[in-house]
Each structure stands twice: as C-alpha cells, then as structure tokens.
Amino acid sequence: MTDDLLKSADERLTPINERLSLLSRRRGLTFGTDSYLLAAFVRANPSGDAVELGGGTGVVSLLCLAREKFARILSAEIQPEYADLIRRNAALNGLGDRLTAWEGDVRSLTVDVTGGEVRAVFSNPPYLPMSAGFTNDSDEMNTARREENGTIRDFAAAASRLLCWGGLFTVVYRPDRLTELFTALRDARLEPKKMLLVHPTPASPPSLVLVEAKKGAGEGIRIARPLFIYPDRPGGAYTADMQAVYDDFSLAHLF
C-alpha cells in the first residue's frame, strides 16, 4: 500500500497524527515544530476560505483543515514537485475537495486566482536573505529557505493584495529578522496585533517568532508570554505549555 503511494525512492510516507499522514521528500522539506506552531496559531474561520503562501508539502494547510479551521484553502507553491505533493497529500487525506495547490510565484498571485478577497492568509516564508553565507546541497531546500523567489516584503505585499479589510496575515519567522518583518508588514498596511516568541529552553534565546497582523488596523500589539518547548534540554519531555499546544492545537493559553 505504501509503495503504491510513493513515486520514487526519494519519497516517504510519515504519520503526522491519528488523522493525517504526509508524503514528503527524503532530502527536502520536513514537518517541523515551526509548521505545527503556525497551524496552531492561525485563527479559525470555519466557514471561510484561506490562502497559504509557500505551501511546501501542504502540511500546515492539512493540519488547519483537519481541525476545521477553514472551509477551503488555496496553497501557493512555486516548486512543481511540491505543488504535486500538496495535491497528492490532499487526496491521501480525503481533503482533495478542500485543498487546492496553485503552482506559481506569490509575487504574481492576485484575487483573480483566489476568486476574491479572503479573511485569512498564512505563511512560513523563506527566511534567509540571498546575502546569507549558508547554502544547502539541496536546490529544493535553498528555494524553500532562501529568498530566491521573493523577500518578506513580497510575501507581505501578496498577503495584503489577497486580504479583505480587517483580514489576518499569520506568519512564522526568525526573531533576528523581526525588524524587517514588522517593516514589511506595516508597509503593506498590515498592522502587527499579536506576537509570540518561541524558545527551545528557558536558557535559550528565541528561535521562532509568530506574528498575527491585521489589514488596516490601528496601532497596538499583544505580546504573549514566551513559549518554552523543553524545560532544560532539547529532545526531552515537553514543558506543560508545549504539551498544551499539542493537546489543544492552540496557543491561546499563552496570551
């Protein structure tokens, strides 16, 4: 059964939870903490549609749909191999009628593609500038993590084009680029309204930041208490707060 689902030896099938399984590429994008936290942080609108910018394997959209956060999601992905994975993962999990992959550049994504404005856009965008020295042996990973096909400004501008007035853009990003993120959001008329910093341990600096921005909103931001994933060392038991995220699929208890 598993072999029938895999197109090549470079693919694998991984159970995500009791509801979902994920087809992925062995040397490509994997399901990580950032994906789960983004899906948990996204505010639900069960009767509405949403757009994901940079879908990868589709795991964030799949998690949101499995928890009935949205009625339908369009996931934009520039890499053909991953757009194909999104379609196959949607079909595999019985969500083919609710998750659509759009293969293309987010810089050219407009409401003509989505069929109108939406109330929610979310993204785990590339976070390494082209000037960064780090490169990966995998071209797929470079495309996903480096700003080869759009900067955070481009992703914020795309979100703003697609959102109705008062719509929400939710993003997971690197804390060391928080200034650039906030500048990009405000230049796109997206006002940061909620923020949460994620630390591997209480003794570690933050490794992720989650931000919810609202189109056309006034100033004022709510900052959550920090989320510590592990109490002392990475790889051990989760903190009570992190376990609550997995149990409840929500970060509301931190605000």
What are the roles of these predicted feature ranges?
Residues 2-45:
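Class I SAM-dependent transferase core
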Residues 19, 47, 70, 96-98, ...:
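A generic structural signal for alpha->beta connector loops
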Residues 23, 100-102, 193-196:
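General small-molecule cofactor/ligand-binding pocket signal
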Residues 31, 148-206:
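Conserved Class I SAM-dependent methyltransferase catalytic core
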Residues 38, 124, 155, 213:
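Residue-level signal for inorganic ion chemistry
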Residues 40-134:
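Conserved SAM/SAH cofactor-binding pocket of Class I
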Residues 125-154:
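Mobile active-site "lid"/loop adjacent to the S-adenosyl-L-methionine
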Residues 205-255:
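SAM/dcSAM-binding transferase cores
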